[in-house]
Structure formats: C-alpha cells, structure tokens
Amino acid sequence: MRRFLLAATSSVALLLPVGAVAVPAAAAEPAPPVGTVTDFGVQSTALTVFEGHLGTDAAGQPAWYGAQMGTPGVVAMVDPVNRTHRATFELPDSSGGWGITQSDDGTVYAGSYPNAHVYRIDPATSAVTDLGAPVAGQTVLYGFRPGRDGRIYGGTYPGSHVFSYSPTEGFRDYGSMYPGQHYALDVAVDPDREVLWAAVGTGGHLIRLDLRTGEKRDIWPADLQGDVNHPYDINLVGGRLFVKRSKLQALVLDPDTGAVLADNFTISSRGTSGLAPDGRTVYFTSGTSLWHYDVATDTLGPVRDAGGAEVRSGGPGVGFGFLDGRLHALIGNYFGDALWYDPTTGANERFKLPFPHQPIDINNITTAPDGRVYTNLYINGNLSALDPATGTATNLGRIGQADGFGWHDGIMYQGVYPNASVHAYDPNKPFRAGTNPRELFRLQADHGQNRPVAFADAGTAMYIGSTPDYGMFGGALTRYDYTTGQHTVQRDIIPDQGVISLAVVGDTLWGGSSINGGGGTTPRATEARLFTVDLDTGAVTDRGVPVPGASSVTSLAAGPDGRLWGLADNTLFVVDPISGALVRRVTLPGRYGGVQDDLFVNPDEHVYVSLDGYLLRVDPLSYAVTVLRDAGTYRLTQDRQGDLWFRSGVKGNNNAVQYGARLLRYAPPADACPGSDLRVTVIVDGVDSGVANRYRPDGCTVNDLIREQDHATHEALMEHVTAVTRALVDAGILTRTDRVAIISAAARSDG
C-alpha cells in the first residue's frame, strides 16, 4: 500500500494525497481524494515564571533573573529598581526551568526540563552555554543553590540525584538520595561545613548529605517519613532548616538532628528569603500575606505595616532578595507581580515587572458545538478560543491546567490539575474568573486525586475519570448529576490503577485504566484493564485486559460498526460490547510516549488515531492503517464536522515532547458516500456474495455502489452490477474472482 505523508507549513493550507489503493484508478473511477493541513500558529503567549533569583549584572547592579516557560524556555533579566526588561536568554532545546541561581563568581545558572540540562549565562557577554546533562537519563533539574568557588548544586527527576557543577571540575554526581524515590525537589547547602540537604519526594524524606564523605542520613521526623505530604522547598537560614511540605504545611528543623523548632504554620512561597540585614529575620509568604520568622527567638507571624495592618503579597513568593535594607520579592508565576517592604518604616508597595510573555506548549484542546476551538496552556492554564473562519484567537483567561474536557448542552466541563477540581464554563457568557467558569467540586483532599483526565456525557450525568495524587495509588470514577449538581465518587475502581479513558456505548459506560499511580510511584499493577458501568443500575464489571502487557488504555470510542474501539499503548483493539469478546487487535506505528494518545470516529466512518506524533487513518472494514503524518501530531480532538485538531511537537532523544505551542487542523478528504454501508461482505438484494466489502478511494464502499433500489428489473440490476464490478476490477479494488462471486450473488437475487 502506498502511503502519503502530510507536512504542514506556517499559516498555509497544503493539499496532499492521503488515499491509498493497490493500483492506479481507471479513468472511469474517481481519483484518490486529498486532505488538508492548516497551521493556525501560536494561539497565545503567556507568562510563567517558575522561580526568580535576585542577583547582579556584570557591573554589580541589581537584577532579577527569572526562569520562564517557553518554546524554548528562557531566562529573563529585569531591573528591580527601574522596572525595565533588560535581556532575554534562550535555553535551546528546553521548555523552561525549575532552577535558577547565581554563583559567587557572578555566573548565572539555570536548570531545565524536559532535557535536564544546565545552562550557563554570562551577564557580561550575554553568552548562553549549554553545559549538558549532569546526570544521564533525567528530565527535570530542581533547586539550584550556590556554593563556593563558582560551584552550584541541584537535584534531579526521575532519579532523585544530587549533583554539582564547577568551572574547574565540571559535573559531579552524588548519586540517588533515597532508593526507589524519584524526586530531589530542592537542596540547601552549608558551604562552610560542606553539608547539603535534599528534599526527597514523594515518599517523604529529608536527606542530610556529607559532601566530603558521601554519608547520607534521613533527618525527616520519623512520624512523617513515608507521608506523601513530603518536603518540597528547603532553605538553610540562620542555622535553621526551613521546610515547606508539598501541601504547604511548614516546619523549622535543627539541620543536624531534625528536631522540630517550629511548626503549625504554612508557607505558600517557593521557600524563604535569606537572612535579612538585621541578622535575625527570615521572610516568606503564607497564603497571600507576607510573614517573618525570628531566628533569635524561633517565633513567627504576619508582617505588619506602620498602621498595624498585615502586608499583603497578593500571592506566593517565587523569589526573594534584599536591596538597600528592603525586602524585594517576585510574587506569583503568571502576572509579573512584585513587592518591596521596608522593615524600618513598614512601607511597602506591590507593582508589576515586565517579564516577557512567551509562546507556551498547548496542554489540551477541545472543540465547541459552535465550531470554536479552545486551547489550554501547560501549567500556565490560559484558555484561548479560536474562530476557525477568521483564524483569530482570543485569550479568555486562566482556568488552570485542564487535563480533560467534556461538553453537555453547550457547557464546557474542565478537569483542572493539581486539585482535581472540576469546573463548568458557559461560552455564551463573559469569562470571569471564579464565576464563569465556576468550580463545581474538588477530588484531591477527600479522594486523593489530582488529574481529572477523561469525560463522558451520559445524558443525565457526566462521568469523569481521574488519576491519583502524588505518591498515591488508585484512580476514581466520578458521576456528576446535571439536575441535582451532586457528585458521587468510586475510588480505586480498578485496584491501584487510574481511570484515563471513558466512552458510552448504548446503555453502558466503558472505562480504561492505566497501571500508573500518582507522580513519584512505581506501578503495582502490570496490565491496563477495561471495565463497564451499567448506566441504569451503576453495577461495575471488570472486563479484563484488552491488550496483554499494555500499560494504559489511553482512548475509547463507540466505533462506526457499533463496537467499542480502543487504544492501548500502540495497539488498536475492537471489542464486541454485548459479549465483551475481543474482535480485533492491530499494532500501530509508533509507541506510547506519555503524551495522551487519542482516537476519534469520523463522519467518513474511518477511525483517526494520534499516537507518538503520528496521525493515522484506520479503515473500519479492512483495518488497514494509512499514515497521514509521521510526526508532530499531539493531543488530537475532532470538531462536529469531522475536522481534526492537534498541537505541534518535536520528540527528543529522551522521548520528551517539546515545541508544542502551535495549533493545526487536518481536514479529511471529502466523502462521496456519507453514511456508508459497512456490512462486512458485499450483499446484493439480500444475497451474500461472501466477498469482503471494501472502500473505493472516494469513500464509497462496494455496497454503496451497488444500488438495487435504482433498478426496476432484475436484468437492469445485472447490467448495473456487471458495470460496477468491471470498473472496480479495472481500478484494482476487486479481483476477477471477487467480481464473479458478486455477479453470481446478483443472479441468485432474482427470485
């Protein structure tokens, strides 16, 4: 079979052939149809500052360095005094960075994801040097801290390693901090004593590492070890170790013994400030207020202005520093907010800093009944709406990272990470944060979920599949009743597995699982499974393993033949929904790569699949697979008229997908026979020929072409069948043997 690849170029539509037949069509037969790919470009730019460091430029003047998301990721340099943007440094082959610091020799270092490289920035020359990966096989670097003699330290995911870099030595790997754990989320360093501390998740460990001997000791309080509310941000200040846990509760510990010096408070910021010029005060944000801790008395509380009112930060701090006795802070990730506070007078100001907006990877896509296409940005959470007719995209506002979408009666339902919150948005009303969309409920605190990923409209209720929170096992199936507004949750419906795909077939809800637990866990299960829910009784039935060895059933749909079609890793499967019996498995190009893969049943009856960057078209009669695109196809969805929408992407050597900020559309070829006759064999006036039914390139099946109703006499029908089958033989669609069998069936139909 010949295959044709579709390649998109910016802002133009390409007409390329996608049909495939064994031999060229005869002159009397229609030519293979064409499809179009249109690139609608970047839908919105946005700001996401992961962390900021208040340092200096080459002349010793103050400068904020902010690690930002982007395609590629960048570090922005902003003047905190003049409030001007001074420079943007690109981090090639990255999508952003979770670590940023400045060494004692003035060099700025950033740690990236998903390539886990260290980048060196010279403030004097603006040169950016990619120093490479400090530890092989990692995807994220965290928690950069300076040491002595130009050395910096950091942590990694998924190996929970700690490493250092110095200009003279290069990289040094101190190894994994705790067996079986994946995250070394932050580090704190005492250069004088050559001791480092590492926050390890998601199992809950705080490792004290002697940098000279390599000795490791877990100083996390024994009653908290193993708790998924694990150490997240850590700072060594004034001889104390400040620890923010993943759910924001905080502790102050003795850095050598782990003894608790203070607790029962929260930290919302990315850790704390360093020690203030007074030699005793440490600052952080708690909720949306500025707080302080006195290391001389081990007391803490909100910071107050001259009038006694709490100093409001307006959000969590993501970087702290001191200038001329004042505290300076970057506030929040998304809006460029900042704060200064003068502890002498109590004066303070909240203001904006001009961090530059960047194109950011699209996290998810959904299409509305009115034809608009909505995109949601990774982590940042901005929601944009595209009018395909004009090509105009409108940025609506932030909803949070939507890992799943559903629709009912014109209302968009959104599953938002990290609180596993479900929201409802009416596109016909103005977008107003907090009211439209409005939050319906959360699944994190009471049910241990963090990503609602699968939505299925069952008429009277929306069913939602979700995956467990960090360090936990067991997804959930939630039913939201449209009339009452109530929801019910069934946790761990497939033991130790998440619920990641749903489809309604008849009066039954089908679900597919993933063996993966929450972030930082190792799977307990070995194979993904199917289950059903009777929509009348609510009874749940385990339907077994559709594809042996598959880790995830990533997509399910009611097929064009009335059967259940699904995708498990790189295998397409078809199941009889009545008996539950497996009908077919087809191995597809590509492999499961971590980005949600999808399949959709098109109005042309074919099934379209995105897998590992491929766009595939599956014939529902023969199960033949045609490759339409062999790269750059992610987060597929389909609109009401059958056009397919997806985002761009480039797959790296570590299988991470980057550069996904562009939205594209594939319009399938025109279908000459909508609603095709999909009976398995060719049937003439009720007589089964035994010949497999099949498609002509223009979308007509053989059964479509034999039109018994158009012929009043049997003689006319015979002439018609003879002519149709002759043309199909000439086109290479039927063999001569097939033709004889079909004509024979037509002959037997008289009587």
Model-assigned labels for residue ranges:
Residues 69-70, 114, 158, 202, ...:
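Residue-level signature of beta-propeller blades and closely related beta-rich strand-turn architectures
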Residues 670-751:
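Soluble extracellular-acting proteins and domains
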